[in-house]
Regions:
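Active-site-proximal beta-alpha core segment in soluble small-molecule metabolic enzymes
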Residues: 5-10, 14-25, 36-206, 220
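Divalent metal-coordination and catalytic microenvironments
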Residues: 23, 77, 209, 251, ...
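Solvent-exposed alpha-helices and their adjacent loops that cap or buttress functional pockets
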Residues: 32-34, 100, 121-122, 128, ...
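Fold-independent oxyanion-binding glycine-rich loops
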Residues: 42-44, 70-71, 110-112, 131-133, ...
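Structural beta-strand/beta-sheet cores of well-ordered domains, especially the beta-sheet scaffolds
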Residues: 105, 203, 222, 226, ...
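Short beta-strand-to-turn element immediately C-terminal to the catalytic PLP-Schiff-base lysine
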Residues: 140-141, 215-216, 254, 318-320
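Anionic-ligand-binding alpha/beta catalytic cores of soluble enzymes and soluble regulatory domains
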Residues: 177-274
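C-terminal accessory subdomain/extension
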Residues: 256-394
């Protein structure tokens, strides 16, 4: 293939476009709601949008630091040239904390074992003590908190760690009226008092992620850890954020079929009337949930049309309807599977709803390994393949 032909292929295939200006706008919108700092949580490849692209766009919107759930992600930020503070939580106790500290990465400490490991491997490391504020997931159980704070203070006096933060996390922030939120807030306030009482002076006190930041100022403290909100997901439904993703693909073929034509694996759908079927070269290997057939809609030739039959590994069938005057779609036309919703196209929230999942799950599953990824905004357009963090042009 000539370079021109390659380029042609590249511009007409399935394409996931990431508009990083949405990320910047979202951070700005969130910053207007809180006096605290914004930590951009760019775990899971920036919620499937691209770690470095989301990180850069978040800084442009006023985020001042990063949060990740593995040291690998922290190093990826450093390798990409980001010098801001990075906090990593969820690290196994035998992680390379020495390497983390040398890279200037702050470490969450959910208990004595982590504290000992950090003190041994990375004397002087900056740590955030992590309190379980009601999830029974990550963080020290409240009954171990006092002891953890005192042990940490002793380690700090001996020069083994510096406790720069205290963190908690709310289980039910997406439901602002849920009683667990009040309990979580009180537990966190207690946790901070205990830390201060033990002689610790944590400058960073953080409880809120996106939903709590948007819906409850009492959770704000000195900083918010924002992940979903970066990419336009607001579970609390209280603020209008902007989605950054658009997935498009060409119609490979359009065919006319008679009434009674079964479609796809398992023949789960049969055409009730003569109709036209369009074939879209995107499927569950690209992150579309297989079960979304017959509930999902896509936009083609300006109208919403239903997905029919089961979604296959790399293709999806759309019922274009019998009437070309209503949906004048032809082979080669671009189908929008989702976008920010500006022109009536579905959004990733619609897709998540159609399969009964969270938008977070839907967006983090997208993209590997076939979708071409294009980043737009901030005066750059770059191309690459998702899942590889690659960008061919910059
Ligand atoms: C993922 C995560 C966040 C970010 O949460 P969002 O709701 O996506 O903003 C914050 N804190 C912790 C501990 C997390 O694991």
């Amino acid at each position: 293939m000539t370079p021109a032909a390659l380029q042609q292929t590249a511009t007409t295939g399935p394409t996931l476009t990431v508009d990083v200006t949405a990320v910047t706008a979202n951070v700005r919108a969130i910053r207007r709601l809180t006096a605290g700092e914004v930590m951009a949580v760019v775990k899971s490849d920036g919620f499937g949008h691209g770690l470095a692209d989301v990180a850069r766009a978040a800084l442009a919107g006023g985020a001042t630091r990063f949060g990740v759930t593995s040291l690998e992600e922290a190093y990826a930020l450093r390798d990409a040239g980001f010098t801001q503070p990075v906090l990593s939580w969820l690290n196994p106790v035998d992680s390379d904390f020495g390497g983390a500290a040398r890279a200037g990465v702050e470490i969450a400490v959910p208990g004595d074992a982590h504290l000992r490991a950090v003190a041994r491997q990375a004397p002087g490391a900056r740590v955030h003590l992590q309190l379980d504020t009601g999830m029974a997931r990550d963080g020290a159980p409240p009954e171990q908190w006092e002891s953890l704070c005192h042990t940490a203070r002793r380690a700090e006096r001996a020069g083994f760690v510096r406790v720069v933060g205290v963190m908690g996390h709310l289980a039910c922030a997406a439901e602002p009226g849920h009683p667990a939120n009040g309990r979580g807030r009180e537990l966190f306030d207690w946790g901070v008092r205990v830390a201060l009482g033990a002689g610790l002076r944590p400058r960073d006190r953080h409880l809120a992620a996106t939903a709590a930041t948007l819906s409850d100022p009492r959770t704000h403290h000195s900083l918010s850890r924002i992940g979903a909100g970066l990419v336009g997901i607001d579970e609390s439904g209280s603020v209008r954020l902007r989605r950054a993703l658009r997935l498009t693909a060409p119609l490979v073929t359009v065919r006319t079929v008679p009434a009674g034509t079964p479609v796809g694996y398992g023949h789960t759908w049969t055409s009730p009337r003569a109709t036209r079927l369009g074939l879209v070269p995107v499927g569950y290997a690209d992150g579309l949930p297989r079960g979304a057939g017959e509930r999902a809609l896509v936009q083609v030739a300006g109208v919403r049309r239903p997905v029919v039959g089961r979604i296959s590994m790399d293709m999806t069938v759309v019922d274009l309807g019998p009437d070309p005057a209503v949906c004048p779609a032809r082979a080669g036309d671009v189908v929008t599977l989702f976008g920010p919703g500006d022109t009536g196209e579905p959004t990733t929230a619609d897709w998540a709803r159609w399969v009964g999942t969270l938008e977070h799950e839907f967006v983090t599953a997208l993209g590997r390994p076939r979708l071409r990824r294009v980043v737009i905004g901030h005066g750059v357009t770059s191309h690459g393949v998702t899942g590889q963090g690659e960008q061919a042009a910059r």
